[in-house]
Swiss-Prot record:
Record flagged with keyword Hydrolase: yes
Name used for this protein in its record: ATP-dependent Clp protease proteolytic subunit
Matches recorded under PANTHER family: ATP-DEPENDENT CLP PROTEASE PROTEOLYTIC SUBUNIT, CHLOROPLASTIC ATP-DEPENDENT CLP PROTEASE PROTEOLYTIC SUBUNIT 1
Residues at the catalytic site: 101 (nucleophile), 126
Keywords assigned by UniProt, alphabetized: Chloroplast, Hydrolase, Plastid, Protease, Serine protease
Matches recorded under Pfam families: CLP_protease
Source lineage: Eukaryota, Viridiplantae, Streptophyta, Embryophyta, Tracheophyta
GO molecular-function terms, A-Z: ATP-dependent peptidase activity; ATPase binding; serine-type endopeptidase activity
Reactions this protein catalyses: Hydrolysis of proteins to small peptides in the presence of ATP and magnesium. alpha-casein is the usual test substrate. In the absence of ATP, only oligopeptides shorter than five residues are hydrolyzed (such as succinyl-Leu-Tyr-|-NHMec, and Leu-Tyr-Leu-|-Tyr-Trp, in which cleavage of the -Tyr-|-Leu- and -Tyr-|-Trp bonds also occurs)
Length: 196
């Protein structure tokens, strides 16, 4: 029998009674949220709305995004990244398992000096991909051109946020490059590796 989403006690400031809320709502109230699945439109919209709401609520207190994701849809991930740059509070990113593909792009989008990896975390970068299997020739060409533009944008962001030269980032993005937490720190994808 599944246990569902655990409930935890919560008391709002100034209220006498404790109410039981699901654990995610409790964590959201502490400005902690999670990307623990493949990136798609739904999770992207949820994270974006949370960041905007919490930044309106208090624009000086940091937000914390914990990441354990295999990646997913590029445009949805870029929307999360753009929102992180747009909101006023710093967004601290914490890799706690795997940040692969577009999830590593989100990880690198955290506030500089506030991008963290757990000691056994893994980070993987590569170029964006698409499937052209059933496309007409004209569609194939248009999609390939769009993919090249997206790759250039992602490369530019990695260069800006890691401090690595463009040739290093371009070379790394030609294939799947997996990094340990310390390798990701040396590469500039994270700023700090937590101690064991």
């Amino acid at each position: 029998m599944p246990i569902g989403v655990p409930k935890v006690p919560f008391r709002s400031p100034g209220e006498g009674d404790t109410s039981w809320v699901d654990i995610y709502n409790r964590l959201y109230r502490e400005r902690l949220f999670f990307l623990g699945q493949e990136v798609d439109t739904e999770i992207s919209n949820q994270l974006i709305s949370l960041m905007i709401y919490l930044s309106i609520e208090k624009d000086t207190k940091d937000l914390y995004l914990f990441i354990n994701s295999p990646g997913g849809w590029v445009i949805s991930g870029m929307a999360i990244y753009d929102t992180m740059q747009f909101v006023r509070p710093d967004v601290q990113t914490i890799c706690m398992g795997l940040a692969a593909s577009i999830a590593s792009f989100i990880l690198v989008g955290g506030a500089i000096t506030k991008r963290i990896a757990f000691p056994h975390a893994r980070v993987m970068i590569h170029q964006p991909a698409s499937s052209f299997y059933e496309a007409q020739t004209g569609e194939f060409i248009l999609e390939a051109e769009e993919l090249i533009k997206i790759r250039e944008t992602i490369t530019r962001v990695y260069v800006q946020r890691t401090g690595k030269p463009i040739w290093v980032v371009s070379e790394d993005m030609k294939r799947d490059v997996f990094m340990s937490a310390t390798e990701a720190q040396a590469h500039g994808n994270v700023d700090l590796v937590t101690v064991q």
